[in-house]
Amino acid sequence: MVAHAEINNLSFVYADENEYALQHISLSIQKGEFIVLAGGSGSGKTTLLKHFKKELLPIGKRTGDTYYDGTLLENVPDLLSAQEIGMVFQNPENQLVMDTVIQELAFSLENIGLPSHIIQKRIAELISFLGFQDLLHQSVHTLSGGQKQLVNLAAVLVMQPKLLLLDEPTAQLDPIAAKEFLGLLKRINEELGITIVLSEHRLDEVIPLATRVICMSNGRIVYDGSPKTVVANMWEVEKFRPFIPQIPRLFLEWNAKDIPFTVREAQMKLNNFSAISYVNKPIAQSEKQEVILSAEHISFQYEKNSPLILRDLTVSIEKGEWVALVGKNGTGKSTLLTLLAGLQKARRGKVKWNGKVIHKIDSKERFKSIGYVSQHPYYHFTFDTVWDEVYERARELYGEQGKEIAEHQLKKFWLYGLKERHPHDCSGGEQQLLALCTTLLSKPTLLLLDEPTKGLDPWKKERVGELFRKLQKEGTTIVMATHDIEFAAKYVDQCMMLFDGAVIMNDAPKEFFSGNFFYTTSINRFIRKELPYALTWEDVYEACPNDILHS
């Protein structure tokens, strides 16, 4: 049987670079598979995905061949490629080109010359399948991140593709929107028979959906097989262990023979064994510190007659505290960060830093002492190479020492090997690290971070978490907006949930997540009855004996 898509001994190096992004890749994909590409940042996942669609082939030197339904990729007709091979990217903003949802859906169909009655029929049928009729005539700019990504997916599906490629499609979605999006992908795969190849760092939700997992490292395929086989292989190599989702990781630590991947599977296994006993230890309360940053009764809207994004919101952040802002896409987390940074001014209320109204502080002092990283890191970039981005800022701050400091900083953030690359050619995770790397050069005492772990692989995420903890011990105050529940649960001091323009929950992670049904970790959902405050596999492993499954 001819493979749906096939790659034979593909190697690729980007233009003006020496290190190969892909090395000797051979891969065969059958119709109807649901494949998850796993691996570290810069391991070649995005580059590999782009080699399945000729319009997206990156510029550089390649050897080897790619086939689609038995035809060399470069010989696949343009119209066929446009219709049958679809791709959804990480950033929901990047693919939207029209003003309204219905225009976005019609755009691609009009481009391939379909008559209006066929366009109307396809859109009607798809909207009925996806179930978002209420969004059809809305402006795409008013949609939440989850809704925008749903529209991106719909704009690809309306072409009736046979192969669907997705590059970290849930990276900017809140946990509930991400779960809904992935559930829709599974439905598309099972009900429509569309082949799916998806790259992802957060494997907890996607591995249970996959029929096959491919793990990459340094441009090579290191493991390829069923989810259980690949996870078992990853367990044998220390550097891949952080990539294993929380529930299977816990059971592997317990030396279980049959590894569960979902909360339901894990609970069924636990029901077969003696109940876990636990001591409900009191949670230590940290000493109160001085309030260094506050927002007092602030309200904000982008236009005079537009809806309020924030309404009468009051928060206070203590010196040296690490706070996570969580909540659904569109609840105002990013807006609040820009107000705290002094980049925008509240319509009502005041933001104070060190007791001073933020807008009365000299802008140079603000820029040096307050580090802000947007959820769109490429907004920060003004130079043509990674090196220039870091060196020019280091030279501005430290003069002749700038070169040495820039080299050290690039190595610290795993970017030195990319120093000649254009920032826009870096992966999403690499862009995130570059923006963070540059921002930290000024040694800010306040860090305001919008989705700082987005696009980072689990290993780098742990290193960044440790770096933030070190900065915190040195007196840095950190406020971050995040959808990464596991990261927040493991590292932060305080969690605040935004809803309807206000903070509705504010607590330490263990109290915050243990009281939630949806906004909590997979480990807590699995074992909250036995261990109410357990949020990570480490929490459970510490509380339970190693041989629990054999008791």
From Swiss-Prot:
It is found in: Cell membrane. The keyword Translocase applies. SMART domains: AAA. It comes from the Bacteria. Keywords: ATP-binding, Cell membrane, Membrane, Nucleotide-binding, Repeat, Translocase, Transport. InterPro entries: AAA+_ATPase, ABC_transporter-like_ATP-bd, ABC_transporter-like_CS, ABC_transpr_CbiO/EcfA_su, ECF_ABC_transporter_ATP-bd, P-loop_NTPase. Signal peptide: none annotated. It is a peripheral membrane protein. One of its GO terms (cellular component) is ATP-binding cassette (ABC) transporter complex. One of its GO terms (molecular function) is ATP hydrolysis activity. Its EC number is 7.-.-.-. ATP 2 binds at residues 327-334. ATP 1 binds at residues 39-46. Residues 5-243, 293-525 form the ABC transporter domain. Probably part of an ABC transporter complex. Responsible for energy coupling to the transport system. Belongs to the ABC transporter superfamily. This is Putative ABC transporter ATP-binding protein BT9727_3105. It comes from Bacillus thuringiensis subsp. konkukian (strain 97-27).
